[in-house]
Amino acid sequence: MRNVKGLFSYMTKTKSFYISIIVIIFIIFIVNRMGPRNYNYKQIGTEINCVKHKVDEQRYLLFPMITILYKYGLGNQLFEVFSLLGSAQTLNRTAIFNADDDILQSKLDLLQKQVPQVAARIISIPIEIAESTRYLFLPACCHYQFPSLFSCERSKFLVIDGQYFQSFKYFSAIDSLIRKLLKPPIDEEIILKKMIGRKDELRFKNCVHIRRGDYVNDFDHAETSSYFTIRAIDYVHTLHPGLVYLISDDPKWVRKQIAEHLDYHDDVKIMETPINAAIRDLYFSQAHCDSVLITAPSSTFGWWIGYMSKNQSNVYYRDIQETDDMVKYKMVEEDFFPPTWKKLGMSRNGSIISK
C-alpha cells in the first residue's frame, strides 16, 4: 500500500512538473508573438523597375540598418547612416528609417543620444510594399557597390539590402555636411579648449587610436599590437615631433605596454574613450589632432578618428595584410581607406616602412 501511495505521489509531482514546463513554453511563445520582431524584407520584390523618364513623385531610400539593429558601436553606425544619406543624395531620394520595423525604432538610442543632429536628418515613415523594390548587395563589409541602374530605378521605395556599407565612397559627396553635423556643440568646445594647456596650444599633436576591448577575444578582428604600435609611434613622432595622445578603451594596458616604452614620456598623454560618450573622441580629433595613427586597421571607430582629423594627409594606418585580421578577406582596401591616407608596414627587422 505504501508503494502505491508513493507511486501516486511521484506521478502527481511529475505531472505538475510537466504542466509547469508546458505553461512556461506557452507564455514564452505568446510573449514572442506579441513582442517586436525583425521586419521581413524578403516580402519585397527584387525586380528593378528601370525607366528613363523623370518621375516627379517623392522617392525614398532605406537600408535595413544592421548596425543599429544589433547595437554595434558608434563607428559602425556612423558608416551606415552616412552611407544612407550620401547614397540618397546621389540618387535624388530622401533617406528614411523604416517606421514599420519596431526593433529598429527601439534601438535608435545610441544615435539619438550621441549624435542627435545626425539622427534628425533621417525621418521614419512606413513603407508601402507594393511600391517598393529591394536590391541585394554582396555580404561584404568594406566594398563599394553602386550599380548604375540605381539611377533609373523609379519605385517609390528603394531598399538596398546590404551589410555595414563601410566605404567612404558612399558619402564622399557629403563630406562637408558630415563635418558640419559632427561639429562639437558650444559646451563641448569649451571642454576641448581646456584639455590643452596654454604652453601646448601651438605644438604638433599626434593622436594614436589603440583598440583592445572585445577585439582581444574576437576571431574576426585583430587588436592593437604593442610591438608594432611602439615602433609606429616612434616613426610618426620622428616625422612630426610634438605631443602624443594615446586614445584607447584600455588605458591600463596602454600605460604598461605602450607609454612606458616611449622615450618622450613627458609628451605622452593617455586618453580613455568614454563608454557612453565615444563621440567626444571624434570632437577631440577635429579640434586637436594634426596627425592620426590607426593601429587596429579594421577598427571603424579608429577610422572615424582619422577621418575627422585636421589634416587628411597625415593619417597613418597599419597594413591589414600583415595582421591576422579576418576582415582583410572581406575588405577592398581602396574602398575603405581614403587615397590620401598612408599605409604603414613593418620589415623583418622591425623597422616601420611606408607602403
Curated annotation (Swiss-Prot):
Tissue and organ distribution: Expression is restricted to the 20 intestinal cells in larvae and adult.
Membrane topology classification: Single-pass type II membrane protein
UniProt-listed Enzyme Commission number(s): 2.4.1.-
Cytoplasmic side: 1-15
Biological process, per Gene Ontology: carbohydrate metabolic process; macromolecule glycosylation; protein glycosylation
Membrane topology, Lumenal segments: 37-355
This protein's pathway: Protein modification; protein glycosylation
Entry keyword annotation includes Glycosyltransferase: yes
The entry's keywords: Glycoprotein, Glycosyltransferase, Golgi apparatus, Membrane, Signal-anchor, Transferase, Transmembrane, Transmembrane helix
Location relative to the cell: Golgi apparatus, Golgi stack membrane
Cellular component GO terms, alphabetical: Golgi cisterna membrane
Pfam families membership: Glyco_transf_11
UniProt keyword Glycoprotein present: yes
Glycosylation sites recorded in the entry for this protein: N92, N311, N349
GO terms, molecular function: galactoside 2-alpha-L-fucosyltransferase activity
TM spans (from-to): 16-36
Family: Belongs to the glycosyltransferase 11 family.
PANTHER family assigned to the protein according to its UniProt record, in alphabetical order: GALACTOSIDE 2-ALPHA-L-FUCOSYLTRANSFERASE-RELATED, UNCHARACTERIZED GLYCOSOL TRANSFERASE-RELATED
Chain's role: Selectively catalyzes the addition of fucose in alpha 1-2 linkage to Gal-beta-(1->4)-Xyl-beta-R, Gal-beta-(1->6)-GlcNAc-R, Gal-beta-(1->3)-Gal-beta-(1->4)-Glc and Gal-beta-(1->3)-Gal-beta-(1->4)-Xyl-R acceptors but not Gal-beta-(1->3)-GlcNAc-beta-(1->3)-Gal-beta-(1->4)-Glc. Unlike in mammals, unable to fucosylate Gal-beta-(1->4)-Glc-beta-R.
Record-given protein name: Galactoside 2-alpha-L-fucosyltransferase
